[in-house]
């Protein structure tokens, strides 16, 4: 039983990686408005935050410092260490 479950999990992971494209969405900040108590969404349009990922390593560098994903090249994302390749 456990072996079958493990095989299923491995198969699912292989299928995910075989697709080759994943989506990273930068989560934004949702706050409560002080005046009327309603929730406000301070995120930009999420469509602009999608970055396709690939299984293949990028040979381009991502050495910039950053505050947001828009500060990095298209193949990079902003991390706590600066711009980094989306696939590692």
From Swiss-Prot:
Residues cleaved off as propeptide: 28-58
Lineage of producing organism: Eukaryota, Metazoa, Spiralia, Lophotrochozoa, Mollusca
S-S pairs: 62-76, 66-78, 72-83
Signal peptide: 1-27
A Pfam family the protein falls into: Toxin_11
Similarity-based family: Belongs to the conotoxin P superfamily.
Record-linked SUPFAM superfamilies: omega toxin-like
GO molecular function term, any single one: toxin activity
Main location: secreted
Function: Neurotoxin. In vivo, elicits 'spasmodic' symptomatology.
Key words, A-Z: Amidation, Cleavage on pair of basic residues, Disulfide bond, Neurotoxin, Secreted, Signal, Toxin
Official protein name in the record: Conotoxin Gm9.1
A cellular component term, taken from the record's GO annotations: extracellular region
Record comment regarding domains: The cysteine framework is IX (C-C-C-C-C-C).
Known tissue expression: Expressed by the venom duct.
Asparagine amide modification, residue list: 87
InterPro entries noted in UniProt: Toxin_11
Location of the protein in the cell: Secreted
